């Protein structure tokens, strides 16, 4: 078992690095921020420090938030392992979509490697996914998840590496079909969002994906799968419509145009509103869950 996690090194101080540093510092972890801009940082979380070179004292957990590039992240890993060759430093990547198997190829100790997937805004979003690297043990995942939970987060533990973690895979599976329906003229973006907001998402809020099918009846669901799944859009490539929109600079709220017209809308105001409304919804769901009947235990079905 790895040593207890008390000292955390945050490598990179962009939006995500800042938010995650705040969560660890606020929870009482000794938090050091490694950034080339260390001397100019003025917004450090209380109790944290910033350095422009790796500190002499080895951290227990080092979390990198470098750009989403395999080579860049691997260079950070090498730098950390070279600085602390005789210490059992756990290295975590903050990637949301890169392959942990590929990232781990540069590591001397891949058995100490995990993925941590935070959701924006990372300091207030309640959930973090903790995923095993290709050589990491169940115990290591649980060990890191326990430290993350100490910062006030709920954790989803994934014991095998999988590109995209859990939530992104589910989200992209739904979105890939949604973009296909828009691209082929079956439904508009507004129609899809209306259906999601009025029924699909509320059902998920209350019963998730899988339990809802138990409630509805797996026999009905299995019958529907036989006719619907073969008709779903499976082409294995990113949606061309979406890629073309981004190439034209139509990236959504930030540029004023995406699937919706955001002309005249203030980016910070809109994002703050979305975060505020999500927080209010989560508070409501927490209250609802406290009053609800205990959930039935999930069965541990053997993997195929």
Task: Map each language-model feature to its residues.
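Active-site-proximal catalytic alpha-helix in oxidoreductases
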Residues: 122-131, 151, 156-186, 194-208, ...
């Amino acid at each position: 078992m790895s040593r207890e996690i008390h000292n955390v090194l945050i490598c990179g101080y962009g939006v995500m690095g800042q938010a995650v540093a705040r969560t660890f510092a606020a929870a009482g972890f000794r938090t050091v921020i490694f950034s080339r801009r260390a001397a100019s940082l003025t917004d450090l979380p209380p109790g944290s420090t910033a350095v422009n070179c790796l500190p002499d004292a080895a951290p227990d957990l080092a979390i990198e938030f470098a750009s989403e590039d395999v080579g860049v992240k691997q260079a950070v890993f090498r730098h950390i392992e070279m600085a602390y060759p005789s210490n059992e430093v756990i290295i975590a990547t903050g990637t949301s979509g890169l392959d942990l198997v590929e990232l781990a190829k540069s590591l001397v100790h891949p058995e100490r490697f995990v993925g941590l997937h935070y959701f924006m805004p990372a300091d207030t979003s309640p959930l973090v996914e903790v995923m095993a690297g290709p050589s990491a043990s169940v115990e290591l995942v649980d060990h890191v998840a326990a430290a993350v939970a100490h910062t006030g987060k709920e954790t989803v533990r994934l014991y095998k590496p999988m590109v995209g973690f859990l939530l992104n895979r589910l989200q992209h599976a739904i979105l890939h079909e949604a973009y296909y329906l828009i691209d082929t003229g079956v439904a508009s973006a507004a129609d899809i969002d209306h259906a999601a907001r009025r029924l699909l998402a509320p059902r998920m809020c209350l019963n998730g994906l899988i339990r809802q099918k138990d409630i509805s009846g797996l026999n009905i669901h299995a019958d529907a799968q036989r006719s619907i799944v073969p008709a779903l859009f499976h082409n294995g490539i990113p949606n061309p419509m979406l890629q073309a929109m981004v190439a034209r600079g139509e990236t959504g709220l930030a540029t004023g145009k995406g699937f919706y017209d955001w002309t005249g809308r203030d980016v910070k105001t809109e994002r703050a509103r979305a975060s505020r409304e999500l927080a209010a919804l989560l508070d409501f769901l927490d209250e609802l869950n406290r009053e609800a009947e205990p959930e039935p235990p999930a069965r541990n079905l053997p993997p195929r």
